[in-house]
Design a protein with these regions (language model features):
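A short, flexible low-complexity segment enriched in Lys/Arg and Gly/Pro that occurs
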Residues: 19-40, 83-85, 203, 207, ...
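A structural signal for short, well-ordered beta-strand segments
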Residues: 21, 63, 132-134, 193, ...
Length: 316
C-alpha cells in the first residue's frame, strides 16, 4: 500500500520512505534494488511501480527504508473550531508559522469525538462542532515551542483549545483520536470510505455529501476523521439499527452518493487502503481508458498467467 498515516505531513507516504526493494516475480525471478540511493535515473523505477500494486505484480521480500531521528520535543494541541472551514484553514496557518515542525494535523468531527470519549471513558478536551488534533515536533530539546503555539492559536482566534502539559496528557489526546475506529463499532455495521480530496475542497465535500446522504437515507449517521495534512478522510456511514444484511443491501447506493461527491470535488475513492475487490468497478471513473490499458499491459508483462493476487485492483 502507499499509506501515509498520522505523521504524513512531516515524513511523507510509503513511496517517500522506501529507498530500495527486493521482490520475487511470478516466474520466480528476483529483482533486488536494496542500495539506498536517493537518486538513480538508470531506467524505469520498478520500486515505485511495485509500491501500491496490492500484490498483483510481485511479492516484496525486503525493503530499504528511510529513517529519521526521534524528535526530542513534542507539543500537542486539541483545537476546537466553529466550522469546518475554520478547521481546514488552520492547517495553512500553522504550516506558515511552524513549517516542517508540524508533524500531525488530524481532523475530527464532533460525532467521532463523542463516540471516542465515551469509549475511552475520557472527557472531550473541548466542546465544538469540529476538532483538530495537531502536533509539533523538533529534533532539539526546546522549552519555548508550546508557548509559541499557544500564543499563535490565540492570535488567530482559536481560543477553544487545550495544550498537553505532560507526556500522559499528550497520550490522552492521542488515545481519543486513535480509539475512534474501535468506538464507532457501537453504532453497528459501517459502510466505510477511504477517500482523499484536495485540501481546499474538503469543506465543500463534507457539506454537499452529508446533505445528500441525509436526504437520501433517513437517520444515517456519519463519523468523519482523518489525516487532513494530505487530504485523507475516513468517511464512515451507519444506517439506523442496520444488520449486516441491511448494510450490504444499501452499500452500493451509499457508496454511489459518496464517490460521486468525491469525484465532483476532484478527489479519489482510494487514499490509503487500496482498491482491492470492492472498488474495482469504480476504476474506469477515476482512470482514463489509456491509463487502464497501460495498467493491463504492465500486469500482463509481469504476470502473464495471472497468478499474483488475481481479481484485485484492475477491472475485468
Amino acid at each position: 500500500c502507499n499509506a501515509g498515516g498520522l505523521n504524513v505531513l512531516r515524513y511523507g507516504t510509503m513511496r517517500d520512505l522506501v529507498l530500495g526493494i527486493e521482490a520475487v516475480l511470478p516466474d520466480g525471478g528476483l529483482v533486488s534494488q536494496l542500495v539506498p540511493l536517493h537518486k538513480n535515473t538508470t531506467g524505469y523505477d520498478l520500486r515505485q511501480l511495485l509500491i501500491g500494486s496490492e500484490g498483483t505484480l510481485a511479492v516484496i521480500t525486503a525493503a530499504t527504508l528511510k529513517l529519521f531521528p526521534l524528535p526530542q520535543t513534542y507539543e500537542t494541541a486539541w483545537v476546537g473550531a466553529d466550522s469546518i472551514d475554520r478547521a481546514v484553514g488552520l492547517l495553512a496557518l500553522v504550516q506558515q508559522r511552524f513549517g516542517e515542525r508540524l508533524t500531525s494535523f488530524e481532523l475530527v468531527g464532533s460525532r467521532a469525538l463523542e463516540l471516542s470519549a465515551a469509549y475511552s471513558r475520557s472527557a472531550a478536551p473541548v466542546s465544538a462542532p469540529w476538532h483538530v488534533l495537531l502536533e509539533l515536533a523538533d529534533a532539539e530539546p526546546r522549552d519555548d515551542l508550546g508557548g509559541l503555539l499557544a500564543e499563535y492559536l490565540l492570535q488567530h482566534g482559536f481560543d477553544n483549545s487545550v495544550l498537553a502539559q505532560s507526556a500522559s496528557e499528550r497520550q490522552t489526546l492521542w488515545t481519543l483520536r486513535e480509539n475512534i475506529s474501535a468506538a464507532q463499532r457501537s453504532l453497528g455495521v459501517s459502510i466505510k470510505h477511504d477517500i482523499a480530496l484536495p485540501i481546499e475542497r474538503v469543506a465543500e465535500f463534507v457539506g454537499s455529501c452529508g446533505a445528500a446522504l441525509r436526504q437520501t437515507f433517513a437517520g444515517i449517521d456519519i463519523v468523519l476523521f482523518g489525516h487532513l495534512g494530505d487530504g485523507s478522510l475516513h468517511y464512515n456511514t451507519f444506517l439506523p439499527a442496520a444488520t449486516n444484511n441491511d448494510a450490504y443491501a444499501y452499500e452500493d447506493a451509499v457508496n454511489t452518493v459518496v464517490y460521486e461527491h468525491v469525484l465532483a470535488c476532484g478527489g479519489t475513492i482510494a487514499a490509503e487502503h487500496g482498491v482491492g475487490i470492492v472498488k474495482r468497478h469504480w476504476l474506469p471513473r477515476v482512470r482514463s481508458a489509456a491509463e487502464l490499458r497501460l495498467m493491463g499491459a504492465v500486469k500482463a508483462a509481469f504476470d502473464p498467467h495471472n497468478i499474483m493476487n488475481p481479481g484485485k485492483l484492475l477491472p475485468d
